[in-house]
Each structure stands twice: as structure tokens, then as C-alpha cells.
Amino acid sequence: LNTACTSAANGLLYGARMLAADLYRRVLVLAFETPSAIAQQGFGALGLVSPSGEYRPFHPQRDGLVLGEAYAATLLALEPGPAPLARLLGGFSACDTSSLTNTREDGSHIEWVMREALHSAKVSAGQIGLVKPHGTATGANDRAECNGVRRLFGDALPPLCVLKPWLGH
């Protein structure tokens, strides 16, 4: 499964769906991002890679993303073992078809996806203690994410944690 930045999250959602459909008792989700010349050239051609190499999402002097490397494995099960580390309450994924490489800068699509995810998890926006945005450190994406988060949370913004260089694209 490759859905670019959302591959690992979509892997978790698909795994959860397989469990809910009673296809499996356990699902192992493996995710990785390995730096490659193809990725670097692709993002470079789009003008998204930081020429300075400094990662500054949501900063006035941001100049693009810094690609990272990460590997992860998560075992999903309907019946947790003796010490589960986390619970997947729900989630939602969608593509913004308004553009091939961007999302709507007004944040409406991002807000909609977050609302659907909260609804799926049966959680309210007020219960969220941390938001991990996409964080490409590009003007259009930063504006879209800021607007989407602001539309959902209003003035009660939870902290943001951006991890792209440490978790990969």
C-alpha cells in the first residue's frame, strides 16, 4: 500500500477494517520510509525540498520539507494482549481532488477529514491533546493546515507536533 505521506496511517485503518470484518484475529502493519533519489528528485521537481536543509514548518522563514527515514511495526488485534501500548479508536482518510499535489488553502478539506476521524473514533475535538500535522514546511500546505486546525478547534488549539524529518515522508 503506497499512499505517500499517509501510507502508515492508511495501513492502520485497513488493518482495523480487516479485523472488524473478522477476516483475521491479528494484523501486522509494517511501515517504512527510506530516502531515495527518486523521492528527492520528485519532491525537488515540485519545488518542495528545503534548499537550506533546515526544517521550519509554520515558520515565516520556512523553505520546504526535509525528508526523513523511519521504520515501524504495529500489531493490531481485537483482543489486546496483557499490556497493550495503545488503542486505535477510529480514523478516516480521503483525497482532496481539487489538486494533484495540494489541498484547499482555506482548510475546509482538512477540517472535514479531521471531523470524520473524530466521529469515527467517537471523540470530540475538546478531547484532543495533541495534533500531528502533515508539516511539509511549504507555504500552501502550512496555510491549509493552519486554517483546517483553526476551523476545527477555534481558539482552543492543542499543541502541534511535526515529525516529518524523523518519521519520513
Summary of predicted features, one role per range:
Residues 3-7, 31-36, 92-96, 135-137, ...:
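Acidic, glycine-rich active-site loops and adjacent beta-strand->loop/helix elements
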Residues 100-106, 136-153:
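Short glycine/threonine-rich loop-to-helix capping motif typified by GTGT followed
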